[in-house]
């Protein structure tokens, strides 16, 4: 009988960054949201996130790595959702 590996805890997350003229978002998946955010802010994350102080706008726990990657794909295409999160960020920082 084949043994299954235990499901890995996975999260999908949305980061935000804003200044007076621009608002940016970044969507990704990870096993540890806090550690991943620290990597992004230390300049060791994805190239597109380097040089900015990112804020966690949204995170969602997923049942598996595969599900997290699927949710990431969908969130990257849901611009209205990310725009709403960024508007909330701009309101908080104003």
Per-region residue spans from a language model:
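GIY-YIG nuclease catalytic motif and its immediate N-terminal context
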Residues: 1-55, 59-81, 87-94
């Amino acid at each position: 009988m084949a043994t299954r590996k235990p499901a890995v805890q996975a999260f999908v997350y949305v980061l935000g960054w804003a200044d007076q003229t621009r608002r940016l978002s970044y969507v990704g998946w990870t096993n540890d949201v806090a550690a991943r955010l620290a990597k992004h802010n230390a300049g060791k994350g994805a190239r597109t996130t380097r040089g900015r102080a990112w804020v966690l706008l949204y995170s969602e726990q997923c049942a598996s790595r595969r599900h997290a990657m699927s949710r990431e794909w969908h969130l990257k295409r849901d611009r209205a959702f990310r725009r709403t999160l960024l508007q909330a960020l701009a309101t908080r920082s104003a």
